[in-house]
From Swiss-Prot:
GO terms for cellular component: cytoplasm. One of its GO terms (molecular function) is nucleoside triphosphate diphosphatase activity. The active site is at D77 (proton acceptor). Pfam families: Maf. It catalyses: a ribonucleoside 5'-triphosphate + H2O = a ribonucleoside 5'-phosphate + diphosphate + H(+); a 2'-deoxyribonucleoside 5'-triphosphate + H2O = a 2'-deoxyribonucleoside 5'-phosphate + diphosphate + H(+). This is Nucleoside triphosphate pyrophosphatase. Its EC number is 3.6.1.9. CDD domains: Maf. InterPro entries: ITPase-like_fam (IPR029001), Maf-like (IPR003697). Coiled coil: none annotated. It is found in: Cytoplasm. It comes from Rickettsia typhi (strain ATCC VR-144 / Wilmington). The keyword Endoplasmic reticulum does not apply. Its cofactor is a divalent metal cation.
Length: 227
């Protein structure tokens, strides 16, 4: 009889509550959350897609170097851009306003670099993917720009807007993965996990019902985050 091999524990190399919630949608709860503190400054003339995958790789490999036990590490980085121009992860209301003005009435792209590492017996196996979604905003009035830039939701978001928030009212067109815009392309994530031997059916049957794991996630963010 073929021996059944249990899933390796999943580690999320991110401090993003949204990514935790996205994984929960597909019934995956990380065993650990280990944010990777890396320099996210773009290199000179670096393009959006290469930046996203470079940062995702950097996060994954840093966390992989910090752990000893066999695990699967999921890391991602999301970059928004108008053409070749990378939009910042807004940290101020003025940056939010700048980003919203840039995308008003135009198509822009959201890239998420995905890097998943299977660490087993000190051997690393990689799966990497860059996913692109195209978004078009309607032409925004000054009133709409000023109103949105006064909200908190664009702060700390790639491109200065939260697509699943009020900004959704501005979208006239989306081509590609919606979960990619939010920070983690779920289709590609599941495909990569499966290719690394992760048994999705085992995870939904067992891991997602572990209340202690859910409590760990909630405690990490200081409030309940999994519904």
């Amino acid at each position: 009889m073929k021996q059944h091999i249990k899933n390796l524990p999943i580690i999320l190399a991110s401090s993003s509550l949204t990514r935790v919630e996205l994984l929960d949608r597909i019934k995956i709860i990380p065993a650990q959350i280990i944010p990777a503190d890396i320099d996210e400054t773009p290199n000179l003339r670096e393009l959006p897609a290469p930046l996203a995958i470079r940062l995702a790789y950097g996060k994954a490999i840093k966390v992989a170097s910090q752990i000893e036990k066999s695990s699967i590490i999921i890391a991602a980085d999301t970059v928004a851009a108008v053409g070749r121009r990378i939009l910042p992860k807004a940290t101020t209301y003025e940056e939010v306003k700048h980003c919203i003005k840039m995308v008003s009435g135009r198509r822009h792209r959201v890239y998420t670099g995905l890097c998943i590492i299977k660490k087993e017996n000190n051997q690393l196996t990689f799966r990497q993917k860059i996913v692109q979604t195209i978004i078009k905003f309607k032409k925004l009035s000054d009133e709409e720009i000023n109103f949105y830039s006064s909200l908190d939701e664009g702060i700390d978001k790639a491109g200065g807007c939260k697509i699943s928030g009020y900004a959704e009212a501005f979208i006239s067109f989306i081509s590609g993965s919606y979960s990619n815009i939010m920070g983690l392309p779920l289709f590609e994530t599941v495909n990569a996990l499966t290719s690394l031997g992760f048994r999705y059916s085992d995870n939904t049957a067992n891991v997602c019902k572990d209340l202690s794991t859910k409590s760990m996630v909630q405690n990490h963010f200081g409030k309940p985050s999994i519904s």
